[in-house]
Amino acid sequence: MAEVANNEEQAPQFNIQRVYTKDISFETPNSPAVFQKEWTPEVKLDLDTRSNKLSDDVYEVVLSLTVTAKNGEETAFLCEVQQAGIFAITGLTEQQLAHSLGAYCPNVLFPYAREAVGSLVSRGTFPQLNLAPVNFDALFAQYVQQRQAAAAEAPAEEANA
């Protein structure tokens, strides 16, 4: 019977406790002149994630999106959204937890951030902006590879010193 209880405690669990907007900003530095020009924007998306441990098995993950639209040389708008979530995560290995915080949680948060960006852009009276889905699993794998490469280079540099 105790064995069954231990197995239940070890089973991975993932619960979303809260999803919220942590920070939001929309700027149109060249309005109203930007509305008088032909609309041929160049849109750039920057994103970042970070996480911090709030308590045992409870983590905050923050997905930051910055969307910059330039019309020619002028900035048409700058939109920044920090979408956050509080997640209770138990029963994972360190590697699985890192993947959850770096890829799975941002996947949960992205639709909320995308909607916030779209709403802000519309309220700024710009044409609708539909952000494409982001493959956070691939971005996390790339991040892990970069860290491993940097770790492999560090001992080599120390040996040469």
Curated annotation (Swiss-Prot):
One of the protein's GO biological processes: protein folding
SUPFAM superfamilies: SecB-like
Coiled coil regions, renumbered to chain: none
Keywords for the protein's UniProt record, in alphabetical order: Chaperone, Cytoplasm, Protein transport, Translocation, Transport
Superkingdom of source: Bacteria
GO CC annotation: cytoplasm
Any matching Pfam family: SecB
InterPro entries cross-referenced by the UniProt entry: SecB (IPR003708), SecB-like_sf (IPR035958)
Keyword flag Chaperone: yes
Location(s) in or outside the cell: Cytoplasm
One annotated GO molecular function: unfolded protein binding
Keyword Magnesium among UniProt keywords: no
NCBIfam families on file: PRK05751.1-4, secB
PANTHER family (UniProt xref): PROTEIN-EXPORT PROTEIN SECB (PTHR36918:SF1), PTHR36918
HAMAP family for the chain: SecB
Similarity field: Belongs to the SecB family.
Function: One of the proteins required for the normal export of preproteins out of the cell cytoplasm. It is a molecular chaperone that binds to a subset of precursor proteins, maintaining them in a translocation-competent state. It also specifically binds to its receptor SecA.
Subunit structure: Homotetramer, a dimer of dimers. One homotetramer interacts with 1 SecA dimer.
Name of the protein described by the UniProt record: Protein-export protein SecB
Taxonomic source organism: Shewanella piezotolerans (strain WP3 / JCM 13877)
